[in-house]
Amino acid sequence: MNFNNFTSDLNGKTCVKCEKEAKFTGVDPKKAWYCQECFIQMVRNKFRSALSKKKIYKEADARDTLVVYDGSPSGTFLLNQIDDALKQITYKRLMVKPTVLVLVSESEEPEIQQVIKRVAEIKKNFLENVNWFIAHIAFCLYDEPSELKEFECNGIEKITAYKYLLASCSVPTYKKELERMLKEKCLQKLAESLKVTKCMVTDDADDLGRLALDQLCLGRGGSLSSLVTVAEKRNDFMIIRPLCDLSKREISIYNYLCKIDDHYIQFSHTQSQEKSVQTLTDAFIRTLEDEKFYSTINTVLSTASKIHNTNGKDGSRCSMCYVEVAEFQCETCSAVRNSCSENLNIIFS
């Protein structure tokens, strides 16, 4: 990775923390610039600050956590932060008991075997002394939680059924949304199988900003706050988003500076050519960023965090997406269900 990809217009820039020569900036180059040491510390502080906001680990008996690794730069950063925090011997130590979950979306056997081989290499660098499990998103199709096996891809026998289910969805927008919901369902079932109630995911600020706009377009505007917050409680399961304040740019720079940018897993994903709300949202945000509206994502997330649903105050939630609703199922999920020829109620029961 080229150093010049992360630096521009350095003339006269000084670090906002220590007044050394500045070399790196976050999302908006018009704002704060940092020297290398202060930039690394700033990124670490954002990660730790997100976890401390909700006092997620205040109870000693609820520290078991599923840490998701998806092969992305954000996933590598998350592993690095957990690994580093557990090595601390002072008050800075993160009181968490991690289990690493490698989440696979590849469907071909040779690619899955390559992932398993690569994971064995990556494990030597991060969290070597904790349990690692590999699972395909198709694990969500199991009727009941099942025992996970190490050193192999769990859920692989359900891949054909998973592909058939997605193919049965006739509307590209709803197919994308179904994929997202199946992924969350998969994480919940995996957590149940491991008897864990918390799950750290790799969603960063860029991912969440796009998600917020997607959900607004899909009619879930009243539930945006719960979908982008750092901790989302769902009955006996909690989704934790510790990267919610960090952009992909900040994460990529950090990984480069800390020399962990060679611990990714390259997947051969083919970009879908189907037009959908999600692809249009992504194109819209990219256009704004190209036109130097750097704060678009931050503005979206800041606004989304203030929007709360007035329905479902009695604790009722949609059976598929878990947003607060007054009915058994939200209108968006009803539309997703109707666009599929397969019965989704069995999966999301």
Curated annotation (Swiss-Prot):
Plastid is among the record's keywords: no
GO biological process, one term: tRNA wobble uridine modification
Chief localization: cytoplasm
Intracellular or extracellular location(s): Cytoplasm
InterPro entries registered for this protein in UniProt: CTU2, Rossmann-like_a/b/a_fold
GO cellular component: cytosol
UniProt signal peptide: none
GO molecular function, one term: nucleotidyltransferase activity
Gene3D superfamilies recorded: HUPs
Assigned keywords, A-Z: Cytoplasm, tRNA processing
Known pathway: tRNA modification; 5-methoxycarbonylmethyl-2-thiouridine-tRNA biosynthesis
Family of this protein: Belongs to the CTU2/NCS2 family.
Function of the molecule: Plays a central role in 2-thiolation of mcm(5)S(2)U at tRNA wobble positions of tRNA(Lys), tRNA(Glu) and tRNA(Gln). May act by forming a heterodimer with tut-1/ctu-1 that ligates sulfur from thiocarboxylated urm-1 onto the uridine of tRNAs at wobble position.
Stated name of the protein: Cytoplasmic tRNA 2-thiolation protein 2
Gene name linked to the record: tut-2
